[in-house]
């Protein structure tokens, strides 16, 4: 039972990875949308696999590295969603460009959230877990 979250997240990561690759072979989508869906699926896979493995490890340092990988997926997913929504909704090019540029603020936030001082790791009831420390970013 301790590995329930790990198994579920790893399965979701594999499915998202498959979905990402399969999206490239879809014949009816525009080329740009195919690639945006690919990046969305790939980011989701990285997010799920990073946090899925985090629950299974018993070392705080490895858990920290898994969280860093998982957070790459989180921010990649959010950036991909903004790009995809702008494309699908047919927003004017100027508005899309503003939102696309602003979405990369997440990259700066990422580097603030993955600092080792921003979280502490411990073995909980369901496996390794973490808590965030209070600070400007958290």
Residue ranges and their predicted role:
Residues 1-16, 28-125, 135-138:
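Individual alpha-helical transmembrane segments in multi-pass integral membrane proteins
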Residues 17-23:
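Alpha-helical transmembrane segments
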């Amino acid at each position: 039972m301790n590995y329930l979250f790990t198994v579920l997240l790893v399965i979701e990561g594999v499915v998202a990875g498959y979905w990402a690759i399969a999206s490239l072979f879809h014949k009816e989508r525009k080329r740009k949308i195919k690639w945006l869906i690919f990046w969305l699926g790939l980011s989701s896979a990285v997010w799920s696999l990073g946090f899925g493995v985090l629950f299974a490890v018993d070392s705080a340092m490895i858990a920290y590295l898994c969280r860093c990988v998982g957070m790459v997926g989180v921010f990649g997913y959010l950036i991909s969603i903004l790009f995809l929504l702008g494309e699908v909704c047919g927003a004017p090019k100027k508005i899309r460009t503003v939102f696309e540029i602003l979405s990369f603020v997440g990259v700066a936030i990422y580097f603030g959230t993955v600092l080792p001082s921003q979280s502490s790791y411990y073995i909980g009831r369901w496996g390794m877990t973490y808590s965030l420390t209070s600070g400007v970013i958290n």
